Amino acid sequence: MKRLTMLMFLLLPLVLYGEDLPFQGVVGKVIDGDTIELKSGELVRYIGIDAPETEYSRKKQPQAFGKEATEANRRLVEGKTVRFEYDKQVKDDNNRLLAYVYIGETFVNGELVRKGFALYSPFSPNKSKNILLLQCENEARKNKLGIWALPLRNPSKEYLASKAGKEGIIKKFHLLECPHARRIDARNKVIFSSIDEALDDGYRPCRICNPLERHNH
């Protein structure tokens, strides 16, 4: 029964999208720390992680540790045959494949997070590896690896968040000046004295104000 359930889970994306999805491929080019291009031409975005940008950010500048993250991804996969596992959503709005990527027994998404080259970034509805990826991030954070060793770009004595709402909604924390923070009702306001406190309470960084953004040494 367990084997049948797993097979149905793996085949579900094929049924929903009605197309042939690659379950392995040779990596022709590493785009950045969380995206690759196969020799067959498909772009693949790693599910559940977010590496620093190398080409641009909201400030039109590369982000700290972007080059290092790209190079780490390159060392892991470039020119090699990788295999894919899919979740409920198999393509994003840019028509990139969304996948959990493996090389041999190495879970590439998790390895990049575990060594501090990328952050855990939950993405609904693709949730099957969330617990594992969060464990990888906690390990990197505890050991101050990679991104976690760099100083914050905008350090703050306080971070704001809203009390948990509907089940399944990702809880976010914000810098004080973030527009989303200003809209939080006083009755629902949660104040954290550190990023670690917010993360330990299950909150994730806002993608608009990006309280985890770092400086290069």
Protein language model features and the residues they cover:
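Small beta-barrel nucleic-acid-binding modules, primarily SNase/OB-fold domains
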Residues: K2-L10, L14-H217
